C-alpha cells in the first residue's frame, strides 16, 4: 500500500520556485517524490526527524545538498509536503 502525498498551495509555490532555480535536479526531485510515495522509509531518502524550531517535522534528502521537509500522518498514510530547498535554509523556512 502506498502513501498519499499532499501538495499544499504553499509547498507547490515553493517547489515551482525551487525547480526554476535548480532545473538540473528535476529528475532527482521527481524520483525522490516517487520513492517517498512508495516507501518513505527507504534508506536512500535518509528520512529523519528534525529538532528545534522544526520539531515535529521530518526531512528526506533529494541529494547531499537539497532536501524536502514534511509531516507524516501515520494513521492516514498521508505525507504533507512542507518545504523544499537547500539544507542550510531550513532554519528560517524561506524555501529556496
Predicted regions and their residues:
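Residue-level signal for beta-strand positions within conserved beta-sheet cores that form or flank
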Residues: 1, 43-46, 77-80
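Arg/Lys-rich, positively charged N-terminal/basic patches that mediate binding to nucleic acids
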Residues: 1-32
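Enriched for short, Lys/Arg-rich terminal
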Residues: 4, 65-67, 71-96
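Nucleotide phosphate-binding site architecture
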Residues: 12, 51, 91
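Short, hydrophobic secondary-structure boundary micro-motifs
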Residues: 27-28, 44-48, 93
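A short, surface-exposed loop/turn module that caps and links secondary-structure elements
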Residues: 34-60
Amino acid at each position: 500500500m502506498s502513501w498519499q502525498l499532499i501538495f499544499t498551495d504553499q509547498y507547490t509555490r515553493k517547489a515551482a520556485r525551487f525547480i526554476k532555480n535548480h532545473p538540473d535536479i528535476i529528475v532527482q526531485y521527481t524520483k525522490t517524490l516517487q520513492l517517498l510515495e512508495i516507501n518513505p522509509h527507504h534508506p536512500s531518502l535518509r528520512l529523519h526527524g528534525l529538532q528545534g524550531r522544526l520539531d515535529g517535522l521530518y526531512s528526506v534528502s533529494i541529494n547531499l545538498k537539497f532536501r524536502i521537509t514534511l509531516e507524516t500522518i501515520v494513521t492516514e498514510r498521508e505525507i504533507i509536503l512542507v518545504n523544499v530547498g537547500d539544507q542550510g535554509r531550513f532554519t528560517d523556512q524561506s524555501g529556496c
